[in-house]
Regions:
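FAD-site-proximal beta/loop scaffold in flavoenzymes
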Residues: 68-122
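A short alpha-helix-loop-beta-strand transition element characteristic
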Residues: 1, 90-95, 147-153
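C-terminal auxiliary extensions adjacent to catalytic cores
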Residues: 161-190
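A conserved FAD-binding loop/helix module that cradles the flavin
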Residues: 117-158
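Conserved mixed alpha/beta catalytic, RNA-binding, or beta-rich assembly cores of soluble enzyme
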Residues: 28, 63, 92-94, 128
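Generic structural signal for well-ordered, non-membrane alpha-helical segments
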Residues: 14, 63, 75-76, 100, ...
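A Rossmann-like FAD-binding core segment of flavoenzymes
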Residues: 1-84
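General structural feature for long, well-ordered alpha-helical segments within catalytic domains
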Residues: 17, 30, 78, 113, ...
Length: 190
């Protein structure tokens, strides 16, 4: 990877991912965009250029890179078709990627006994999806009588604490707040 280029003035993704990339020595060029890709029959290079606060290119700030690939990321959308079919309440949360099911801290949706985790509950980091799945599993085990309440709450708290670091950075914090809003809304309706 020659560089990460983003027109935004700061990294919009999760800090954990940016840190992994930075540790490998890949440079970040914030407030930049790709001006041009070069090559005859394939990509052989790219020129980036700095942009101002209105995202307009600033002449004279071009930088050249020898690359054979240009990757573009444009976002993700939650997959909620099955949840809609079950009658789950769906809310709009642009921070979480769009239309997501309202759900509790235990990952239970507005339809009793229907739980959600991962991208279906809102686009977040993959490790967050795993933790949400664990929380949903614990809640189901508790509901079915395989865990008593103190043990369930103890294990759920361990999982919730492990999610804190994953929701660091401006992007992660915003998603954490959006999830908290969904949880609070469900608790108020209960």
């Amino acid at each position: 990877v020659a560089a990460v280029i983003d027109a935004a003035p700061e990294i919009g993704g999760y800090a954990v991912h940016a840190a992994k990339i930075a540790r490998t020595g890949v440079p970040f060029f914030m407030s930049h965009t790709i001006k041009e890709a070069h090559g005859k029959d394939r990509v052989e290079g790219a020129t980036i250029i700095e942009v101002d606060e209105d995202w307009k290119p600033i002449p004279g700030t071009e930088k050249q890179f020898d690359v054979d690939t240009v990757c573009i990321a444009v976002g993700l959308n939650p997959m909620n078709q099955l949840l809609r079919m079950t009658g789950c309440k769906i809310v709009d949360s642009p921070v979480l990627g769009g239309k997501v099911p309202s759900h509790s801290l235990n990952q239970e949706t507005s339809v009793k006994g229907v739980y959600v985790a991962g991208d279906a509950s809102g686009i977040e980091e993959a490790s967050t999806a795993i933790i949400e799945g664990r929380i949903a599993g614990l809640a189901i085990a508790f509901r079915l009588g395989y865990l008593d309440e103190p043990e369930f709450l103890k294990q759920r708290e361990v999982q919730l604490k492990s999610m804190v670091g994953l929701r660091s950075g401006s992007h992660g914090e915003a998603r954490g707040k959006a999830k908290q809003y969904l949880n609070d809304t469900m608790e108020a309706q209960a």
